[in-house]
A protein has these predicted regions:
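Active-site-proximal alpha-helical scaffold in enzymes
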Residues: 48-79, 119-148, 219-226, 289-292
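Short catalytic helix/loop segments, enriched in acidic residues and glycine
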Residues: 1-2, 32, 94-99
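N-terminal extracellular/periplasmic Venus flytrap/periplasmic-binding protein-like
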Residues: 4, 128-230, 293-300
């Protein structure tokens, strides 16, 4: 349980955003806090590590507490993919010096092409990718049906103002969002097998074995031991360790292969000690490559899809 406490006691709010530009720019963390009605004294900072931005935000918030900078902090992640500049026809520009030679050309690879590179280097078949994706949908739908996310999803009324040209008025529509829309009940092995490659004409990465575009956000409240005792909060987890690792940009999805062992070493635990593994599955290809390379137990990976 999270008891009431003075919001002014929050030392910092760290928000991860993979594309902190356009509507998500101008320090979206601070803007979000102000729009949410937090006291003006509560600061906010936006951090970016692409896919791991939200994860890094939680780690940064934890480290602020661990180093004594504050007692209470929030780590969060937010992304509105429909508002990203690239979704509106705008091109993302890169520092031109990056392409003065062939050495760093992989910086220009889209994520889909990096997934195809993983397929090639790690020998992941189209059939295995589709099977993994289908299983992920089934697990997510089962978790939703069982109410696993009920206490994690904050119901939100989505309001849309749309022009009605027949009446020359603006029409307000409202709908309640309380369930993730990504998992698809109509997906099947046959339907997935019919999809064409999305990123390379002779590739195997499709829209079906890749994650969908999403808009969403999540946050974690972190406290020191002293703050927990002072507020009477009931912790649900303890922050033990965090690690990052650099890998070739063209196969960026295999980052966990290097980072997971480092995090385990920092925490002083073995891989076999972990009962639940949440692994990035932006593409089935990269998830399978990581699972196989690290010999992870598939039953422990993303149990809820």
């Amino acid at each position: 349980a999270v008891p009431a406490f003075d919001l002014n006691d929050i030392g910092d709010v760290v928000v991860g955003c993979a594309m902190p530009e356009a509507e998500q720019g101008m320090n979206v963390a601070r803007i979000g806090l102000l729009l949410a009605g937090f006291p003006v004294s509560v600061p906010g900072i936006t951090v970016n590590r692409f896919c791991a931005s939200g994860l890094n935000a939680v780690a940064d918030a934890a480290m602020k507490i661990m180093t004594g900078q504050c007692d209470i902090a929030i780590g969060a992640g937010t992304e509105s993919m429909t508002a990203m500049p690239t979704m509106m026809g705008n091109k993302v520009t890169v520092n031109p010096r990056a392409f003065e030679s062939d050495e760093h050309v992989a910086i220009a690879y889209g994520m889909g092409l990096t997934a195809e590179k993983v397929v090639q280097q790690y020998g992941v078949s189209r059939e295995d990718q589709d099977a993994f994706a289908l299983a992920s949908h089934h697990k997510a739908l089962a978790a939703i049906a069982a109410g696993r996310f009920r206490d994690e999803v904050l119901p939100y009324t989505v309001r849309s103002h749309l022009p009605d040209l027949s009446s020359n008025t603006v029409r307000l529509t409202e709908r309640l969002f309380d369930t993730d829309e990504g998992p698809r009940a109509d997906s099947s092995a046959q339907a997935l097998a019919k999809l064409r490659p999305a990123f390379s004409a002779r590739g195997s990465v499709t829209a079906g074995n890749s994650s969908q575009m999403s808009d969403g956000a999540a946050a974690v409240l972190l406290m020191s031991e002293a703050a927990v005792q002072r507020t009477g909060a009931t912790p649900i987890a303890r922050f033990r360790s965090f690690a990052v690792a650099g890998v070739p940009p063209e196969i960026m999805g295999i980052g966990p292969v290097e980072a997971i062992p480092r995090a385990l070493t920092q925490a002083g635990i073995a891989q076999a000690d972990i009962d639940w593994i949440e692994l990035n599955e932006a593409f089935a290809a990269q998830a399978l490559a990581v699972i196989r390379t690290l010999d992870l137990d598939p039953a422990k990976v993303n149990p809820h899809g």
